[in-house]
Amino acid sequence: MKDFYLYDDVPVLRNLLNIKDEKLLEEAESNITYVKLLDIDDKICGDAFDYQRIKDIHTYIFGDLYEWAGKERGINIVKGERVLGGDTVRYADTNSIEPEMEAALKELNQVKWEVLDISETAELFSKLIAKIWQIHPFREGNTRTIITFATQFSEKHGFRMNKALLKDNSEYVRDALVKASDGMYSEYEYLIPVSYTHLRAH
């Protein structure tokens, strides 16, 4: 299927800046999203940790770059992952994005986080965030969006993820999410150190 998110003449995401050089787009995206992430907790707040919040986060971070920010992707995607030997994570089919997301978020919100100790919290939180991330609701920007959602959720529920996590360890975070999403026998230990190291009890 043709990827209609790309320009016709170059394999670069269509963007509001009309940048057709992949490296220049990556640089612009990095600069813009860095600034957006500085004040996102002031812009996206409240007690509802639902699918709309995830869409709002994506819209705020990427709205100056992509007209489809905050909208579900319209194509199925594959991404070769180094830590999987070039294989792809099995992301949600476009027809199942919303129901899978609603189910995953329901599971996340039903946990009684206050009764878990820090190691139990780290393990369960890692599994559930990995499940949400694996759905990959957007064409691009899923990791930054879901990790932002995760940091806000953890703050609200009495445990903390270091907000420098994404900025300072973005490659490791993505690799950990990839490994945690790798098939039926998911290797959550690759993701647990991320949460456990950066989780701090109040």
Write out the residue ranges for each language-model feature.
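Helix-hairpin-helix/helix-loop-helix acidic hairpins
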Residues: 91-136
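Hydrophobic (often cysteine-bearing) scaffold residues that line and stabilize catalytic clefts
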Residues: 50, 54, 121, 125, ...
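N-terminal structured helix/loop subdomain that forms the ligand-binding/catalytic interface
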Residues: 1-72, 153-155, 159-162
